[in-house]
């Protein structure tokens, strides 16, 4: 197996395209075997195999700083950075963490399971390197789902304003925990699903294959034409307006194409977005066909669990009181709201990865006479303490918080523990 010879990122450099394709398949097999046994996040990691390989071939980690937003999609990164042999112990006692861990490896810069933070880390690191004269590169990998979070927009705004040299890799699979809630994501979907653009791109590629004698001149012309066609349908106006160069979209499962895009991004001064289209659950039929989560988290909601009991109770309460509404921050399944949403779709609100907005929106609903129920993980609730304290508590509003995954949660490491809820919420 080729994978047996990959102990560190430098081992990727001597592989040809055929070997890289085989390696991708071997990594997917290891992911499926391990995650189906130990639990964890399968779909997101199956979708990022080629992108991760390309990142580690183009950049020199850990000298170049590769940062991962949320962190649940770093299994391939772990495999390629010296933890291949330990990977079968993922999320087990004395095994490796399900999220990045600074204790595990110098390749893991930030320990995180909270979304939308990576661009702020990137801005800070790039600022530090600039002041010290350090030439190392900063790369921030963020999903389209994480771009629904307000902190991500704050990071984009500051990167564009400062002009710091950061490569932002937008991993666009069209999904996070649930269908992505965002007007920006809707724009990205229009790019990935526009049939005219896709047909013309395919025809241009076929034309190039049929006339190899034209060579590099035709290739450059076709690239420019493809870019023009793309921009007719969805100009990268959003990023450009912030002062950030936009490149893409690119096929996230074509290693050569990704490597070329990343290499091009390095040549620009200032921040650059490299928009990469990937398929969540790639190469594993059960994950590809899981329309709810694409096997985001294989542990799921167990029969007889507190989450299941809450789910059933909320539906009953909703049936008896039409003023009861439910709010989730991009996690309707994990927090037990799918049954309520199916029964009362107009009374279930998914606000995207935006816990602060969820809480204050609930406050507004309560002011308007509704009885909002905010379903949220304990670890994510702490992101909205100010809103709970002032927007709900100070106004003495009838908002109910149903807090899941409280206490020491174990498998996914320190950033997923729910240890602060009681102390922060007590009077």
Residue ranges and their predicted role:
Residues 70-75, 142-148, 170-176, 280, ...:
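Acidic, glycine-rich active-site loops and adjacent beta-strand->loop/helix elements
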């Amino acid at each position: 197996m080729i994978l047996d010879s990959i102990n560190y990122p430098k081992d990727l450099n001597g592989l040809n395209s055929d070997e890289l394709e085989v390696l991708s398949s071997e990594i997917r097999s290891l992911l499926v075997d391990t995650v189906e046994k130990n639990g964890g996040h399968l779909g997101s990691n199956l979708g990022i195999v080629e992108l991760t390989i390309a990142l580690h071939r183009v950049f020199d980690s850990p000298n170049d700083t590769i940062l991962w937003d949320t962190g649940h999609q770093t299994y391939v990164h772990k495999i390629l950075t010296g933890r291949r042999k330990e990977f079968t112990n993922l999320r087990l006692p004395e095994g490796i963490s399900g999220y990045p861990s600074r204790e595990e490896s110098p390749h893991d810069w930030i320990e995180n399971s909270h979304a939308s933070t990576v661009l702020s880390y990137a801005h800070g690191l790039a600022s530090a390197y600039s002041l010290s004269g350090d030439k190392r590169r900063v790369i921030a990998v963020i999903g389209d789902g994480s771009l629904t979070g307000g902190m991500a927009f704050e990071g984009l705004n500051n990167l564009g304003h400062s002009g710091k040299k950061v490569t932002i890799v937008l991993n666009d699979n069209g999904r996070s925990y649930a269908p992505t809630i965002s007007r920006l994501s809707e724009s990205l979907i229009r790019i990935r699903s526009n049939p005219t653009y896709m047909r013309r791109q395919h025809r241009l590629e076929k034309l190039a294959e049929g006339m190899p004698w034209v060579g590099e001149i035709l290739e450059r012309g076709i690239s420019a034409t493809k870019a023009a066609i793309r921009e007719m349908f969805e100009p990268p106006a959003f990023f450009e307006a912030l002062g950030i160069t936009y490149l893409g979209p690119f096929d996230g499962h074509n290693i050569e194409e990704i490597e070329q895009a990343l290499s091009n991004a390095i040549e620009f001064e200032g921040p650059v977005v490299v928009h990469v289209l990937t398929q969540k659950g790639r190469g594993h039929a059960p994950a590809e066909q899981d329309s709810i989560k694409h096997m985001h988290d294989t542990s799921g909601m167990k029969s007889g669990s507190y989450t299941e009991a809450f789910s059933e109770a909320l539906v009953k309460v909703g049936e008896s009181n039409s003023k009861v509404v439910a709010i989730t921050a991009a996690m309707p399944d994990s927090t037990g709201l799918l049954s309520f949403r199916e029964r009362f779709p107009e009374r279930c609100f998914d606000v995207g990865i935006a816990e602060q907005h969820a809480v204050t929106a609930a406050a507004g609903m309560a002011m308007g006479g509704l009885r909002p129920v905010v379903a949220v993980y304990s670890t994510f609730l702490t992101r909205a303490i100010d809103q709970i304290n002032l927007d709900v508590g100070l106004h003495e509003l009838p908002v109910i918080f149903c807090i899941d995954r409280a206490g020491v949660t174990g498998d996914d490491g320190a950033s997923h523990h729910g240890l602060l809820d009681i102390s922060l919420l007590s009077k």
